[in-house]
Structures are given as C-alpha cells and as structure tokens.
C-alpha cells in the first residue's frame, strides 16, 4: 500500500471558505510539507495544476534539492503545451531528481479556464488530442534511450523527426497517472496510463470504475494499477474526528457554497459532476454528508476536484483504506487541513496500522522516533503496538 501526501499550492487553512485560520502559500511552507512527507515515509506528493494554484513544475523543481527520496506527481497539460516540450521537461526533471518524477495527465474539465489558456475544443476532442499527445510523448522519451528520432501524424498533432536528446532516468519514461470518469477518459486510460486515479467515491462506484478500466486495458494487452485521491480527518477517537470535520466547514455560509457550486456546474467534467452529486450542494450534518461509513462529502461543498474525506479514529480510517485496497487500489493520495500538521498526525496514527508501513522510516538509535529523553538519562517506554 503506497501513501502519498499533497502540496497545497492553492492555499491552506484550518477552515474552508474563509480567510480565518489561513496561512501563506509560499515556498517556505511548501518546503516544510515536502520535507515532512519525505521524512515521515510518504512515497510521494501530488502537486495540483490550473490557474488556482502556483505552477506545479516550478514548485516541484524547487523541492528536489530539499528532499531525498520523495517522488513528485506533476501534471502535463495536452492542448496547452506541446508533447515535445513536455517530453523534454519530464526528462530533465527526472534526471535532476534521479528518477523521482511521476506524470499526472490532466486534460482539464473547466471550459472557462481552458478558453482563458487558448483551448477552444469540446470534451471528446480534448481526449482525442490527449491520445495523440501521449503517443508522441511516449515515443519521444522511449526513443531518447537509443538516440532515435520519431515521426507521428495525427488528426490534431504531428511530429516529424522529433527527438529528445537527453533520456529520462526511468526507462522508457516516467510512469503516467491519470484521472477521469467519462467513457472517453476510461478508454484513454486503458490504452496509455500506468496508474488510474479516482476521486473518493463510495467503494461500489470505485469497483465499477476499476472493472471497466481493467477490461479496456486488457483489450490493449495491458495491465494497469489504481489509486484514489482522498482527504483525511483522523483523530484518536471517532467523536473527535467528526467534531474536526464539523469545525472544518463551520465558517461556511450558504452564499459561499452557492457560488462554489455554480462555478463547478459550468464544468464539463464527469468526475466533478459525480462529486457534486454526493452532497447535492447543500450543507448538512454528518447524517447528510456521510455518504458511506467514514466517507464524508463536506470538503466538496467549496473545493473543486477531490471532495471527500475519510473521517474517523485510526482503526476506522485504516479499515476503510483496506476496503478500497481489496478492490484493487494500491496508492492513496491523501491530504488534510492544515497540510503540515495533518501529515504528521496521519503518519503517527495510521501508518502503524497499514500493511508494509512500519519500516518506511529509519528507526535507528539516533533517529528515533522515541520522544523526549526522560530524566536526562532514559529513553521513554516503547508504545504498545496493540
């Protein structure tokens, strides 16, 4: 089971929908979160993309030297950048980080934002462009290992004598990740993607996605891995966790929720539509927003994209993660508000309950973790593992 964290380059806070409890989204803060994730044993971090956040490539590049083993899941944007430029950027990043790059393929689902970036095509055409983009991108980086040139002629994109002179460390190229819920997205994932990402829908819905994409991948003679993107609110007791969930949205008013939902409704993203359907755009208590045991839709009232959180005590959160893992999910990309503190909280409370997590961080005599020395002489008693 792989666990990733999240760099909140669009801002961070203790509350949603208000400046109260907010903190500056600046380099020092991003670095603190990245170093924490690296030290605590998270496999990697996701960096968001779009006009609502800082540029993912610039931020991720700035964090390479601050980390040792952390992987970076960074977006390429078919339709906005050329496949040749994206291939060179990926190769350089992979070389400078010694193979720590993962690629998040983002077609985009907000027509207003896409048009602002100069992209004026409909939903299915975006996926046609993405398909051709990935054919070129993959061929360029694969050919870079043998110093060969490539040709490709498509309906939307072409390359004649394309060449990447510097190959990536990962062969043939950094792994491709992607999330999308439409039939066109599933077909594209089946043909090109190494790890398919879903937002945190209830297990039955996730199982249907996995089955469909596995079948599409098999039709292309491929196998594919699966990941899920979720927020997490974990506390030592269930009561504390649900109180924290209520507190997170306690500053929201109806106007803020309405404005956010109106913005989301203009998108042509099937995934965003499915997120909105979980809460119906209406604030409520646990009874209204707990859409499956320990799965809470409150975040999606004002946050685009991933809008659900696992809420509960450590055992409940771990049990729900294991339930998703039994469906075929092997990577969990998590986040919590505020992101620095919650990266520690989750690692401390839940990592010991997950398979293959105990030895991710060195526990040698000088590195701990063992707590503050007692009486200037003794290590604290070891915590019970039961």
UniProtKB/Swiss-Prot annotation:
Q: Could you tell me which SUPFAM superfamilies the record lists for this protein?
A: Bacterial luciferase-like
Q: Which InterPro entries match?
A: Alkanesulphonate_mOase_FMN-dep (IPR019911), Luciferase-like_dom (IPR011251), Luciferase-like_sf (IPR036661), SsuD_RutA_monooxygenase (IPR050172)
Is Hydrolase tagged as a keyword? no
Biological process according to GO: alkanesulfonate catabolic process
Cite the Gene3D superfamilies for this sequence.
Luciferase-like domain
Q: Is Glycosyltransferase included in the keywords of this UniProt record? A: no
Instruction: Note the Pfam families from the entry.
Output: Bac_luciferase
Reaction(s) the record says it catalyses: an alkanesulfonate + FMNH2 + O2 = an aldehyde + FMN + sulfite + H2O + 2 H(+)
This protein's source sits in the domain of life called Bacteria
Q: What EC number(s) would the UniProt record show?
A: 1.14.14.5
| Keyword annotations from UniProtKB, A to Z | Flavoprotein, FMN, Monooxygenase, Oxidoreductase
Q: GO molecular function terms here?
A: alkanesulfonate monooxygenase activity
Question: What's its job?
Answer: Catalyzes the desulfonation of aliphatic sulfonates.
**HAMAP family listed in its UniProt record:** Alkanesulf_monooxygen (MF_01229)
Query: What's this protein's family per the entry?
Result: Belongs to the SsuD family.
Q: What is this protein called?
A: Alkanesulfonate monooxygenase
* Protein's organism: Paraburkholderia phytofirmans (strain DSM 17436 / LMG 22146 / PsJN) (Burkholderia phytofirmans)
Q: What is the lineage of its organism?
A: Bacteria, Pseudomonadati, Pseudomonadota, Betaproteobacteria, Burkholderiales
Gene name as annotated? ssuD
């Amino acid at each position: 089971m792989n666990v990733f964290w999240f760099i909140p380059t669009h801002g961070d806070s203790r509350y949603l929908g208000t400046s109260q409890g907010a903190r500056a989204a600046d380099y020092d803060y991003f670095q603190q979160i990245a170093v924490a994730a690296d030290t605590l044993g998270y496999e990697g971090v996701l960096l968001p993309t779009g006009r609502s956040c800082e540029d993912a490539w610039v931020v991720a590049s700035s964090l390479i030297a601050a980390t040792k083993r952390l992987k970076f899941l960074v977006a390429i944007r078919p339709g906005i950048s050329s496949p040749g430029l994206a291939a060179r950027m990926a190769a350089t990043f992979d070389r400078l980080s010694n193979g720590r790059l993962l690629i998040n393929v983002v077609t985009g689902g907000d027509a207003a934002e896409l048009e602002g970036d100069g992209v004026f095509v409909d939903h299915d055409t975006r996926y046609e462009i993405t398909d051709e983009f990935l054919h070129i991108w993959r061929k360029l980086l694969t050919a870079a290992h043998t110093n060969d040139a490539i040709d490709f002629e498509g309906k939307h994109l072409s390359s004649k004598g394309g060449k990447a002179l510097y190959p990536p460390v990962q062969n043939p190229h950094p792994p491709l990740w992607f999330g999308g819920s439409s039939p066109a997205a599933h077909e594209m994932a089946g043909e090109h993607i190494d790890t398919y990402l879903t937002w945190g829908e209830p297990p039955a819905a996730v199982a249907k996605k996995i089955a469909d994409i596995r079948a599409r991948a098999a039709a292309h003679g491929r196998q594919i891995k699966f990941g899920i993107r979720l927020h997490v609110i974990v506390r030592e007791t269930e009561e504390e966790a649900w109180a924290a969930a209520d507190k997170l949205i306690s500053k929201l008013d109806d106007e803020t929720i309405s404005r956010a939902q109106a913005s989301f409704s203009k998108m042509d993203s099937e995934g965003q539509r499915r997120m909105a359907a979980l809460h119906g755009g209406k604030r409520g208590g646990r009874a209204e927003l707990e859409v499956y045991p320990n799965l809470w839709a409150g975040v999606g009232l004002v946050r685009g994209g991933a809008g659900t959180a696992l809420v509960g005590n450590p055992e409940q959160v771990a049990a729900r993660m294991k339930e998703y893992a039994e469906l075929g999910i092997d990577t969990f990309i998590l986040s919590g508000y505020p992101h620095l503190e919650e990266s520690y909280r989750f690692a401390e409370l839940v990592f010991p309950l997950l398979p293959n997590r105990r030895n991710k961080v060195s526990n040698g005599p000088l590195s701990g973790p063992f707590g503050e020395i007692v009486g200037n002489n003794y290590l604290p008693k070891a915590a019970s593992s039961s």
